[in-house]
Amino acid sequence: MSRPGIEIILMRQLASYLAVPILIVDRERDLLFFNESAEPILGRRFDETGKIHRGEWTASFRPTDANGLLLPPEEQPLTRAIDRGEPSYRRSWMTGLDGVARVIEGLAFPIATRESGLMGAAGIFWEVRERAAVPPSLAQQAASRPSRSRHAVEVILLRRLANRLLMPILVEDSEGKLLFYNPAAEPLIGRRFAELGPVQLRDWNDEFQPTDEDGSRIKVEDHPLSVARLQQQPCYRRFLYQGLDGVKRRVDAAAFPLLGLCNRHLGAVGIFWEGSR
């Protein structure tokens, strides 16, 4: 049995700390691990299932589209992340091992480095629920909270992992201040993080001027990172923006709340990639 790479080990350690449903597959698409937060959706504890081989977990969870048709493997986010080496997002129905069918949204991204190549993929998924508007008072409370995110073990693990990956990742604290983005994100941001340092998301929003594909400006409270941080719900969105290098780009972005041990609210994580035209 081959030993998992350090990135797989770090991803599993990080997932164990987070209150966000996460599962990990290897490059053969064998299910290596899912965390405690994923157990209510998958309908079984990982201790009861252990590693699930390729094909078995697809047959067990029976992902289907809105019409009830089984999704072929090539349309499933984890398979696309492995086969195409790029992130993939999809909304679908999934039946857990408890027999309950749920509507879920899922993002999968490859776990890959320049040194080791593709080692597997991580899936972050959530049950679809209606999102309420963020009350202004909640946004003010979040902004006034003292931030201790930078020194949290979850953030330290995430930064160690992100700095090794080819996937662009951005992290902000519970106040909406940028904690870091990894080297893979620098070409999309248009500047190295060492040259920029911490900024507030509101200032960030003004600088990048994100818009929908029809040109409508995206309000800061509607940005995926804001939704994830303030509503503590994952969020996916496609938008256009102008980087700090002056280049206009079209990206897909998914953000999820950085909820740590004891449900500590540490901020939000953004994963983004250039969308197809």
Predicted features along the sequence, with ranges:
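Output-coupling edge of small sensory domains
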Residues: 109-111, 256-258
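Conserved hydrophobic beta-strand signature of PAS-family and PAS-like sensory domains
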Residues: 31-32, 178-179
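Terminal output helix/cap of sensory domains in signal transduction proteins
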Residues: 48-94, 196-241
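PAS-family sensory domains
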Residues: 42-43, 50, 189-190, 197
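N-terminal capping loop/helix in small sensory signaling domains highlighted by a polar->aromatic N-x2-3-F motif
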Residues: 35-39, 182-185
